[in-house]
């Protein structure tokens, strides 16, 4: 006998939780922005702090949808993107999320969303559904994964 009792060997796993953290006022601001946009997609930059696998939203930077087909796509103009990044720099924050709405569909990334998620690295996308009035968050790693939205 080698002195090891395999009946008592335990395996431990560590689960990494990816979540984006907002407060209720921020969710209300995003909801209002989406509803005011009617049948057009709304969009915003989420500024905050990224710590390990958590993205903590400190400020919402609302933007206009500059896309030529705003009912099914969104584009943030280069001028507004620059303003958003300047605002983040002034406040010592980073881009920690991208928000947009799907006025007439579910809160899930479209094929177009997935394409643009690739361009933004590991930044969560929050999508609001006008059909169900709920929010869902996603991140692209090897594939698109839903992550938790924690409301503080």
Pin down the residues of each PLM region.
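Short, well-ordered beta-to-alpha junction loops that form the rim of enzyme active sites
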Residues: 101
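Conserved beta-strand-loop surface patch within small alpha/beta domains used
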Residues: 9-95, 104-152
